[in-house]
Regions:
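Acidic, surface-exposed loops and disordered segments
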Residues: 1-135
Length: 135
């Protein structure tokens, strides 16, 4: 017990937020000046300790919980990938060093938070064979 592997970097510093965006954009192969974080001012980076066998599951659950909590508060949010690649690079390793974070952490995802410019669209219909009932 007590072996929760995830940590969260709550990034509100605009300079670091923009650096994360640029690194993410490069990994994505997107055109210059494209913002993978859709202009969101707050980025919660979820990472998990590789020493724990369930670290990817643990980090994914944190991401889902962050997104559900944000939605319940009326805060727009989106899961942005490529945290793994960011934090395997020298760029990410330097962030760990600057923060004094030791250990081997894998980037799970970015939870970008902000307020939507327009209301959310109606959800698409769900696939029919999503749940199988066993009675």
């Amino acid at each position: 017990m007590g072996k929760q592997s995830p940590i969260i970097l709550a990034v509100t510093n605009k300079e670091l937020r923009d650096q994360l965006s640029e690194e993410n954009r490069k990994i994505m192969g997107a055109p210059e000046r494209m913002d993978p974080f859709y202009g969101a001012p707050v980025i919660l980076v979820v990472l998990a300790n590789k020493a724990i066998p369930t670290h990817v599951y643990d980090g994914s659950l944190v991401m889902g919980n962050l997104m559900n909590a944000a939605e319940s508060l009326g805060v727009a949010n989106i899961w942005i990938h490529r945290a793994k690649e960011e934090f395997e690079s020298d760029f990410g390793k330097n962030i760990f060093a600057d923060l004094g974070i030791e250990g081997e952490y894998e980037g799970i995802g970015h939870c970008a938070l902000g307020y939507a410019v327009e209301p959310a669209k109606k959800a698409a219909p769900r696939k029919e064979d999503y749940v199988y009932y066993i009675r």
